[in-house]
Amino acid sequence: MKKKKILVRSVLVLVALAALCACAWCVWYIVQYYQGQAFGDRMRTNISDDGGSFQLGRVKIPVDFDELQTMNPDIYAWIKIPDTDISYAVLQRGAEDDQEYYSKHSENGAYYSGGSIFSQSYNRKDFSDPMTVLYGHNLRNGRMFAQLNGFSDAEVFESHRYIYVYLPDRMLVYEIFAAYPHSNEHLLLCHDFSDAEDFAAYFDDVLARKSLQSNVREDAWPQPSDHILTLSTCYRGDNHQRYLVQGKLVAEAYAK
């Protein structure tokens, strides 16, 4: 009987310790998550919608990349679409790492089902590729890339013409030329955008497949020499489709 009591007590102690550890982990996770959110929100308040008058050729970079990269060295850029809530750090893992890591982790690296805005190692971090793709979830709370689906509305599309990307040493300005639903194929693995014919064929197909959910600016249509930025998110909860918003590089301003 005495041995049985000792065994029961031991089990209860182990259960209590496990519960305590679980609670401690939950508290740590919540603190890490909200610290990351607060940090990102603070950064967002410093970034204006006017792009820092990029036409002048020199801009003050409104993002403190030193502080961001101290928090997480995977942060390498910041994306903003004026007059929307899209204003986030951009992250990328190394070539040997899980390329979907930031689909389930926040900007500070804490686990978060809403993820972050991220690219994959198929792209260079200087946005010099013919096609750069950034991914983000379509969250019900409107965060990340949820507002991209709104570009299916013609008025929204016409009133939002530019995407800003900030790097530590410069700012890139992209003119939005298309927004449309697309299959969930991996663009960078299924197409060679460095090949002029493949590039032209892809975008010819985009024009040919215009639908009620698509909007395009044919006067701003890209050429094979252009650098394209694609923003990709889930299309209205359909895991088999993505909604893409695409822009071409039209201006580049270096830091003051």
Whereabouts are the PLM-identified features?
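Solvent-exposed, non-transmembrane regions of membrane-associated and secreted proteins
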Residues: A22-K256
